[in-house]
Amino acid sequence: MLLLWALPLLLGAVAGLEVCYERLGCFGNRIPWSGGTLERPFSTLPSTPKIVNTRFLLYTNENPNNFQEISADASTIRGSNFRTDRKTRFIIHGFTDKGEENWLSNLCENLFQVETVNCICVDWKGGSRTTYPQATQNIRIVGAEVAYLVGTLQSSLGYSPSNIHVIGHSLGAHAAGEVGRRTNGTIGRITGLDPAEPYFQGTPEIVRLDPSDAQFVDVIHTDAAPMVPNLGFGMSQTVGHLDFFPNGGKEMPGCQKNVLSQIVDINGVWEGTRDFVACNHLRSYKYYADSIVNPNGFAGFSCASYTAFSANKCFPCSNGCPQMGHYADRFSRKTDGVGQTFYLNTGDSSNFARWRYQVAVTLSGRRVTGHVLVSLYGSKGNSKQYEIFTGLLKPGDTHLNEFDSDVDVGDVQKVKFVWYNNVINPTLPKVGASQITVEQNDGRVFKFCSTDTVREDILLTLTPC
């Protein structure tokens, strides 16, 4: 894949100025679309619609496993399981990918678990499996084809564009932007999954995804390190109303595995090889798929930077936490501005959802050197132990920390405290927690108290004060 991204820097060539197609209109290769700028040094026209061969693969709750191919011919839509009383979600893949790749249909399957929906996977492998600069031009054809289908839905079936959500990964995110531009921002929502950076970062809004392309635009950035020298394929530039940078947006947990373990992936050699080449870049659609079935597991925190977030300076959410992914549109202030930036942490495997808690522990008992851990027990489940503090344990001192649990414990009902010496202590001191306060990201606070102290490695249970 890296070769395909880099090769165009040597192979760009000057083409004609404009080409027109009856259904889709005209496409030129002048600035800002192509040639003459630092971001787009080569002049290239899109491939023909026949070569790009945009296809629409419809999955619904009635046919979740086998697609029905539809087109902008209204008769194919009426003869399918498409229903006008449902939302429609388009999914557009990126460079070198295809619409029949498992991740697109898997995303549809997750959607069917939580809603009744028309899920349309857009295949444009005829235009994506070429040199990278050519593919960046071919997304204009893809966007035009999707927009034409949206127009058919509106004119022939009375279907409102506001009921349409376009989800695009990599180059597909900018194809989604082209859909929005051609439909004058009437699309209900566009989600950009790590929008591609080369040939798009720093370009005018007309070329790339931007907030004016839909009534609401949300973006997940997972590979935002610079293309040179870090080989980051995704944009660092904010291009939505809400821009989420999980784990800081550059290096995703689980993407640092050794080469062999990553290629021989649990999902097979093909998926493992894809992960090895572009693990961070692919995480965006995996996070989105996981967010569908974890409605509150991807809370984003408004913060000046990921460094500030990691330093526990952004908790709780004073104006509420938007959820990264599928439920981002439930955030009441989603369109209060553009480029609203949010940070969060995720897991490193298939269960990416995390629930962040802030815990304050007030110590009692002896003065010793050691470290303190707590675990939460709640109405939905129990967390593992998380370290709150290490150092001098002094009675009366309060230590505060935040952690990301892989379990949503629900309403916290009790807390278990344990401590350990940092050095061997023959005096067998006892330490306790007179009070532990647990705060959730929505601002709810739970307080627990105890008058007991315990020796190291002995659990102390605190109950509500």
Swiss-Prot record:
Chief location category: secreted
Keywords: Calcium, Disulfide bond, Hydrolase, Lipid degradation, Lipid metabolism, Metal-binding, Secreted, Signal
Domain PLAT: 355-465
Any one biological process term the GO annotation gives: lipid catabolic process
One Pfam entry name: PLAT
Leader sequence residues: 1-16
Record's catalysed reaction(s): a triacylglycerol + H2O = a diacylglycerol + a fatty acid + H(+); 1,2,3-tributanoylglycerol + H2O = dibutanoylglycerol + butanoate + H(+); 1,2,3-tri-(9Z-octadecenoyl)-glycerol + H2O = di-(9Z)-octadecenoylglycerol + (9Z)-octadecenoate + H(+); all-trans-retinyl hexadecanoate + H2O = all-trans-retinol + hexadecanoate + H(+)
Disulfide-linked positions: C20-C26, C108-C119, C255-C279, C303-C314, C317-C321, C449-C465
Active-site residues, Swiss-Prot/TrEMBL: S170 (nucleophile), D194 (charge relay system), H281 (charge relay system)
GO cellular component: extracellular space
Parts forming coiled coils: none
Activity regulation summary: Inhibited by bile salts, is reactivated by (pro)colipase/CLPS.
Enzyme class label: hydrolase
Places the protein is found: Secreted
Function, as annotated: Plays an important role in fat metabolism. It preferentially splits the esters of long-chain fatty acids at positions 1 and 3, producing mainly 2-monoacylglycerol and free fatty acids, and shows considerably higher activity against insoluble emulsified substrates than against soluble ones.
UniProt similarity note: Belongs to the AB hydrolase superfamily. Lipase family.
Subunit structure of this chain's protein: Forms a 1:1 stoichiometric complex with (pro)colipase/CLPS.
Designated name of the protein: Pancreatic triacylglycerol lipase
Originating species: Oryctolagus cuniculus (Rabbit)
Gene of this entry: PNLIP
